[in-house]
Amino acid sequence: LEANRKKIDFLGFSFHLDTVSVLERAVAMENCMELFEEALARDFEPRVINIGGGYKVNYLENEQDWNDYTSALKEAVLGTRPSMTWHNNAFGMSSDKGKLKGNFNSYSYFDTQTGGSFLQELLSQRFPNLGDATAGSIMQGNMIELWIEPGRSLVDQTGITVARVNSVRMSSRGEPIVCLNMKRQDISFLDQEIFVDPIIIEKHDEEGARQTEQDSQSKEEPIGVYFAGNLCLESDLVHRHMTYLDKLPSPGDLVVFVNSSGYFMDFSASTSIMQPVAEKVAVMERDGKFTWVMDKQYVPFWECMP
């Protein structure tokens, strides 16, 4: 850098960690600030620290729901309750002589600190090597620009992914499989499991009637089903965990996956077996009315905002 200082506009330092740990990020920030001092000593003029993204979101309203579900999954892995997943998929966990080993490989669907509160917690961390001052006060006192790259937290509670039910079949074990006109890649983030139950919108005829075989077979107890994609591959299970419904869906019904904007709806989408990637639609509310256009035709209307 020193040899090419005339060719470089040295802004500062950046990190982007694959972790949501506040403590690990605080260590990275402290390292950046120490590097700031080193750069200043070498007559550079750094002014920016970019701390990347990783600002968590909540996909569930109730923390206890998530704790109860993950506890039940672990019990199933240990064999103390019936399996809740396809072929007892353990999501990184295993049972060894009655003890649980490994880690639950999943994004936490509930967290007490998300979005802005997560950032505030990070900026409140104290650095012993820098006079025990907080990250925020050091940056403010030295006029250091803070750059962030939030991803899913910017679109929290937005976006839906809609698939149509093609058919309902039974596995060799007698488990209902709801086959959708989508594939796992259409609603998957780096092959992570999605633990939010979808919404079922039933198909009705022109008179609003709905008469199906599934309706006549509805049960008092919830029915456990698996959602499968259309690639004819066992790995193409949209959900590898069992989802419990009031009754079986029927062909033509719509299955709606909510809050899917943040990396889920098309992050891993592909054109497998020559299927085109699903079209995206932008929905806008103006003057109390909803309108929509194809996403590629959408133009933000900031100039119309007060």
Residues covered by each model-derived region:
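Glycine-rich beta-strand-to-loop/alpha-helix junction loops that act as flexible
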Residues: 16-18, 49-58, 89-94, 150-152
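Active-site-proximal beta-alpha core segment in soluble small-molecule metabolic enzymes
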Residues: 1-50, 85
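Glycine/serine-rich loop-strand microenvironments at binding/catalytic pocket rims
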Residues: 40-51, 62, 93-104
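Charged (often Lys/Glu-rich) extended helix/loop segments that serve as interaction or gating elements
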Residues: 72, 83-306
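Active-site neighborhood of glycoside hydrolase catalytic domains
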Residues: 41, 73-77, 81
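Short glycine/threonine-rich loop-to-helix capping motif typified by GTGT followed
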Residues: 21-28, 58-70, 157-163, 240-245
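Short linear functional motifs in flexible/disordered or boundary regions
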Residues: 25, 44, 61-63, 85, ...
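Short connector loops at secondary-structure junctions
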Residues: 11-16, 47-54, 215, 219-228
